[in-house]
Amino acid sequence: MQKITGETVRDDFNSINTVLHYTRAAHAIGLWKSERAIITRYLPDRSAEILEAGCGAGRVAVALRQLGYENVTGFDFSSELVEQARNLAEERGLADLIFHQADATRLGDCRPIADRSFDGVLFLFNGMMQIPGRENRRTALRELHRVCRPGGHLIFTTHDRDDPREAAAWAREAELWARGEQNPRLAEFGDRYFTDDNGNTFMHLPDRKEIFEDLAATGWVHVNDRMRDELASETPKVRNFSDNCRFWVARK
């Protein structure tokens, strides 16, 4: 059976149910309290050049512009979501907000991004973990490192496989992998692929050790990491939209 690939994930993100899910969130939820807290702490300059990877339907990029950040550029590899992001920006009177279709593992293919450098880079709502394959995720980290200015920050989120509430589930999953009985479409321990009302979703759930190793291997210096509920008490709407996650901050 064919493994989950980047093309699989792109097709899933272009599906109507997934596009509707992210578009509704962009219109109705906006910036989380935790996102605002960590972004304004590590990127306090409202004139900073900010690149948002995996911008989806524009939820974060549009909210940052409304918060006063003047130079935000977003990209996503889903053409359907990029179109929705542009529509949202236009509806909010931000037609000059720039969105590109681009692949985080191949930023050199998008000259408007590849030819620039940024003060900070964001990859929120666990977007980096929706890239199948650890080496591919490391490639994305290297690409983001390349377009980030020295001293600039990377802020991203992941799930946390070390969460004690998940221990029993991961113990069972480890037994399946030991017997070779895991989902044959998954390539690495920590991968999940599931279907719900919002469509198909691939997600890699790392432990902290994995992220520390990946940052070190790609030139980033770890600065901070905190669970979302340590940063802010989110609204019920946000908690219904997204599980708790770990925020990571790294510096070039």
Segments predicted by a language model, with ranges:
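Core SAM-dependent methyltransferase catalytic element
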Residues: 236-252
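SAM-dependent methyltransferase
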Residues: 155-215, 224-232
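Class I SAM-dependent methyltransferase SAM/SAH-binding core
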Residues: 59-108
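Conserved class I S-adenosyl-L-methionine
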Residues: 1-45
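Class I SAM-dependent methyltransferase "Motif I" SAM/SAH-binding loop
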Residues: 54-56
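A short acidic, Gly/Pro-enriched loop at the edge of an enzyme's catalytic core
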Residues: 110-120
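A short glycine-rich, Lys/Arg-flanked "PGG" loop and its adjoining helix->strand segment in the class I
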Residues: 138-150
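A short SAM/SAH-binding and catalytic strip from SAM-dependent methyltransferases
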Residues: 119-135
